[in-house]
């Protein structure tokens, strides 16, 4: 029976961006299903897990974060703007849009849209809290424009809240986190361990 990975992430997270396509490739190669679960990291997960938004971290931690982002971007050959114009940014609307697409078009389309939105922040200096940017992302992925309206539905909001709570219940405290049968792999730098776990079946 194929394994399922619960993929908890935030569309505004640089670490989610750096791991996104590699994770997708690993899951596909292993024949694993992906549950696409964008979560309210700053509003729900951090307050109960001891995490802090970047701006509230000690200066030393903020500085080293930039060092690590640069290192991993270079190591992985992925372009990344270390200090994008629109960051910090509220990722709630982008997360809800991903959920709306997941509900209607499925996980493959949702993963593709998530990639587009992450690149918008970390490569293209676009503002993912701007409805025009979200609409453009849908168009780039050839997804229905009406998903923008669906993203504001009660169904989507309830799913967003439920997924954020599920992350907390699973012990998730940061993004990205990949959970397989209750086992957490936190961070894009743990994808090798996830790959080994999926290979075990």
Q: Where in this protein do the model-derived segments appear?
A:
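C-terminal cap of thioredoxin/glutaredoxin-like
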Residues: 3-32, 37, 103, 112, ...
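Structural alpha/beta surface segment adjacent to cysteine/selenocysteine redox centers
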Residues: 11, 17-121
């Amino acid at each position: 029976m194929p394994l399922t990975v619960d993929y908890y992430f935030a569309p505004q997270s640089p670490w989610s961006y750096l791991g996104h396509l590699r994770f997708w490739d690993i899951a596909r190669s292993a024949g694993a299903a992906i549950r696409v679960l964008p979560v309210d990291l700053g509003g729900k997960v951090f307050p109960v897990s001891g995490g802090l938004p970047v701006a509230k971290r000690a200066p030393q931690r903020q500085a080293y974060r930039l060092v690590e982002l640069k290192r991993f971007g270079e190591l992985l050959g992925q372009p990344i703007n270390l200090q994008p114009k629109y960051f910090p940014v509220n990722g709630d609307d982008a997360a809800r849009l991903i959920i709306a697409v997941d509900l209607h078009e499925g996980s493959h389309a949702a993963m593709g849209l998530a990639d587009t939105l992450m690149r918008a922040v970390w490569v293209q200096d676009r503002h993912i809290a701007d409805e025009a940017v979200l609409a453009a992302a849908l168009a780039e992925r050839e997804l229905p424009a009406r998903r923008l309206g669906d993203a504001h539905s009660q169904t989507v909001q309830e799913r967003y809240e439920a997924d954020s709570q599920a992350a907390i219940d699973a012990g998730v405290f940061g993004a990205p986190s990949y959970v397989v049968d209750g086992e957490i792999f936190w961070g894009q730098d743990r994808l090798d361990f996830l790959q080994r776990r999926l290979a075990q079946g």
